[in-house]
């Protein structure tokens, strides 16, 4: 019987398997940031160990970095804990070393799941880990990538391996093509809406089908980024010419003969025709419309042309209770059209949607509409995912498009995705966000998050409420 893409990468990296299925898995790339690494470095130090393979580490500061005040340098980091975590990372990498380190305010600094791929740290066939749940992003390259906890960060540093049990295989196919105005973010939100946030639990998901193949590498990263929101620890897309072209000539990519050898191997990284999947889910791309989450879980999502659901129509008592709780927190009434939901803030950024394609997508909407940010919007911020994305966007004049319309053009970082830095929602504020989680308090205590694509967020900023972006596509 043939093997799935997941099977192939797993088999290449298993060092040993116990009778109960617990395996020792070799790790190729270890991505490190300032929040989940300090305890691991200290644990290594106290145990008198050394990092096993320094050349596997690529590090950056992202979660705590401010997106304003860079002219003040490290003094611009107002929160003392955030400042300590960032400076501690600097000290740890200075002591231990790394294949590459992009410190706060450096040209290539940015969100770890953006700077990894753009620097060639993520390559097809790799096993990639990071102390961050959205490490699944890197699966877009045909890599087995997933988040790990802080104790596991230390374990990988010490041994270059991880204890793991193999997951089951799930295939999600998106047939046909999507309509203009429907993006990778809409595709993955529609998938989560279909299978739920627990649908992928215990699985590694391979995303396939014509609509997935048609996506750029940046779009595929968006899809794999949110595999974790579907319950799967990892998501994958098979390697093709787009994958190989993207990683070519990146700083950490192989060159010369090693490049040729790598490409020959990478071209084998796809599921065999007779591979077995434990579960297969199919969606029709033509049925997917721009998505908006209405509740407090990514699975609470509907097309922008729909209305807030009525809990009284839900027969399952547990689901009914969840809907009622979500509507109370979100301050929404059943039956309210999503198009009629007004927002207070707009956030375009995060490891889901802060790459150059996302910047272009949002700027194109702003330019086409030819309007300024609506008067009811308190803040509309655009936060590029890295210094390189920011630089490229400014070369293309995208920053001027945003600023002319009243958006704030910020420095790179995780920003308002999570309430761990200065960018956050105040209690009761409602946000159109291109991030990946809409849990209670995710963007700030009492804040209300609606997940959308960059195009949808940009349109909401200038209209003041959600609109169907297909009207302007």
UniProtKB/Swiss-Prot annotation:
PROSITE patterns: ACONITASE_1, ACONITASE_2. Binds 1 [4Fe-4S] cluster per subunit. Pathway: Amino-acid biosynthesis; L-leucine biosynthesis; L-leucine from 3-methyl-2-oxobutanoate: step 2/4. Its EC number is 4.2.1.33. Pfam families: Aconitase. [4Fe-4S] cluster binds at residues 351, 414, 417. The keyword Lyase applies. It comes from the Bacteria. Keywords: 4Fe-4S, Amino-acid biosynthesis, Branched-chain amino acid biosynthesis, Iron, Iron-sulfur, Leucine biosynthesis, Lyase, Metal-binding. GO terms for molecular function: 3-isopropylmalate dehydratase activity; 4 iron, 4 sulfur cluster binding; metal ion binding. Its cofactor is [4Fe-4S] cluster. It catalyses: (2R,3S)-3-isopropylmalate = (2S)-2-isopropylmalate. GO terms for biological process: L-leucine biosynthetic process. Catalyzes the isomerization between 2-isopropylmalate and 3-isopropylmalate, via the formation of 2-isopropylmaleate. Heterodimer of LeuC and LeuD. Belongs to the aconitase/IPM isomerase family. LeuC type 1 subfamily. This is 3-isopropylmalate dehydratase large subunit. It comes from Paracidovorax citrulli (strain AAC00-1).
């Amino acid at each position: 019987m043939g093997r799935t893409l997941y099977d192939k990468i797993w088999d290449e990296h298993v060092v040993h398997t116990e009778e109960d299925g617990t395996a020792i898995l070799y790790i190729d790339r270890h991505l490190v940031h300032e929040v989940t690494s300090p305890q691991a470095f200290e644990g290594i130090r106290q145990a008198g160990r050394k990092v096993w393979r320094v050349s596997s580490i690529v590090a950056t500061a992202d979660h705590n970095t401010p997106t304003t005040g860079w002219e003040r340098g490290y003094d611009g980091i107002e929160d003392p804990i955030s400042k300590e975590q960032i400076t501690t990372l600097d000290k740890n990498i200075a002591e231990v070393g790394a294949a590459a380190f992009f410190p706060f305010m450096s040209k290539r600094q940015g969100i770890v799941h953006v700077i990894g791929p753009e620097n060639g740290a993520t390559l097809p066939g790799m096993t990639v880990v990071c102390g961050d749940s959205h490490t699944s992003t890197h699966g877009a390259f045909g890599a087995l990538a997933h988040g790990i906890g802080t104790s596991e960060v230390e374990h990988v540093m010490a041994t270059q391996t991880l204890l793991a049990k193999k997951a089951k295989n799930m295939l999600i196919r998106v047939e046909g093509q999507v309509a203009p105005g429907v993006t990778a973010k809409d595709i993955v939100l529609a998938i989560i809406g279909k299978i739920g946030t627990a649908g992928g639990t215990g699985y590694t998901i391979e995303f396939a089908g014509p609509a997935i193949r048609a996506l750029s590498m940046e779009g595929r990263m968006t899809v794999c980024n949110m595999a974790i929101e579907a319950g799967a620890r990892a998501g994958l897309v098979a390697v093709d010419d787009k994958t190989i072209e993207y990683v070519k000539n990146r700083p950490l990519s192989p060159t010369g003969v090693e490049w040729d050898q790598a490409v020959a191997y990478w071209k084998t990284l796809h599921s065999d025709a007779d591979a077995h999947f434990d579960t297969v889910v199919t969606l029709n791309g033509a049925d997917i419309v721009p998505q908006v989450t209405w509740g407090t879980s990514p699975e609470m999502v509907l097309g922008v042309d729909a209305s807030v659901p009525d809990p009284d129509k839900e027969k399952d008592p547990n689901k009914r209770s969840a809907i009622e709780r979500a509507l109370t927190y979100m301050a929404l009434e059943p039956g309210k059209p999503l198009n009629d939901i007004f927002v207070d803030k707009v956030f375009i950024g995060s490891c889901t949607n802060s790459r150059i394609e996302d910047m272009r997508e949002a700027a194109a909407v702003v330019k086409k509409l030819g309007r300024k940010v609506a008067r009811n919007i308190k803040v509309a911020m655009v936060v590029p995912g890295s210094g390189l994305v920011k630089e490229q966007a400014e070369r293309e004049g995208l920053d001027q498009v945003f600023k002319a319309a009243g958006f704030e053009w910020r420095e790179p970082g995780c920003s308002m995705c999570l309430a761990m830095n200065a960018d956050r929602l105040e209690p009761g504020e409602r946000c159109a966000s291109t991030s990946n989680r809409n849990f209670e308090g995710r963007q700030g205590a009492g804040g209300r998050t609606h997940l959308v694509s960059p195009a949808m967020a940009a349109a909401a900023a200038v209209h003041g409420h959600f609109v169907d972006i297909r009207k302007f596509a």
